[in-house]
Amino acid sequence: MNCKLTGFNTCIAAATLLLCSSPLVHAADNCAGVDVLVTQTSETTEIAKNHTISIWKAFSVLSSPDSIYNNTTGECSGVILTTPDGKTQSMGYCARKDKDGDTHSISWHSAPGADKGMWKSTGGTGKFAGKQNSGWFQFAVGDGKMAVTNWGGTCQ
């Protein structure tokens, strides 16, 4: 197996997986925003030609002016599988905190070849405690080191 660091492709795949949104709010959404992600590490192992698994970690800052998630910061990490047909699927977690020290975490995943991924709350403290929020995310733009994803969902 050939193990190497990758930049653009891994970040694109990972950012596609990670959450966040902007004014692309869907009808049922009552929260939305943008997640700005800065890659810390990315390592890809090529199992066979065009069949890879990548481990990715990034700093994350959410911007969502009308929700409790606005200006929460933290980290996201995940695993991205790319199959020989060129489709990717992924899963991972994000953990963030706000200026008051309250924390929240989410799990996220995207199905093989999907344009959008899904996220859901997994825990939190303070204002985030007991939340059962969930929604979608979609890659917007990236350059290999930084990425922006749009997100939306149903938030309590």
Listing of model-derived features with the role each one plays in the protein:
Residues N2-I12:
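Bacterial N-terminal signal peptides that target proteins for export
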Residues C20-S22:
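N-terminal signal peptide c-region/cleavage motif recognized by signal peptidases
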Residues H26-Q156:
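Beta-strand-enriched cores of mature, soluble protein domains
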